Amino acid sequence: MKKFGYSITWIGMDGMKWKHLININLGMVNLSDIPYIIIIHCGANYVGEEPSGNLMYDMKVAFSSLIIEILPGCSIIFSEMLPKRTLRFSYSTHKMEKTRKRVNRGARSCLLKLLGYVIKHPDFEDKYNGLFAKDDVHLSFIGYDIFINTLQGALESLFVLSSLPGLQLITQ
């Protein structure tokens, strides 16, 4: 991203939930300026652990708080939750996939209304073996490469097109 004059800082936390996101971003803002862009990739580990209504509520609160109160002028990008071949908190992968898709749709709808952006990950929808590690939950090295490449492509599109008013970036 250096060719666009931007640097990237990765802030991650094992087990992060949506309700942690606000405090993490408050801490980040206290240490430095408000960033130009934040990409949020969070929530898939808790599909099945929390009711989907609670998960969507936490997402909406986080999006609204970040965009309106904490990070004015910052572009918020939601990286949709990836499918998993196996889910930790469910005996029915099919039901959890339906929940994941429903929550992604809800997050996408909410964020686009708030003039945020969404990154989709269509390469993962077919759940090819090579994209996942042996545990069928985490990504393989190839899966991570594709994931990062999708994020980079979306960011490059945003940087090139960011001068367009009302742009709603949904990469495919």
Write out the residue ranges for each language-model feature:
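A short beta-strand-loop structural module common to alpha/beta enzyme folds
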Residues: K2-I22
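Alpha-helical cap/lid subdomain in secreted, periplasmic
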Residues: K3-S7, I24-T171
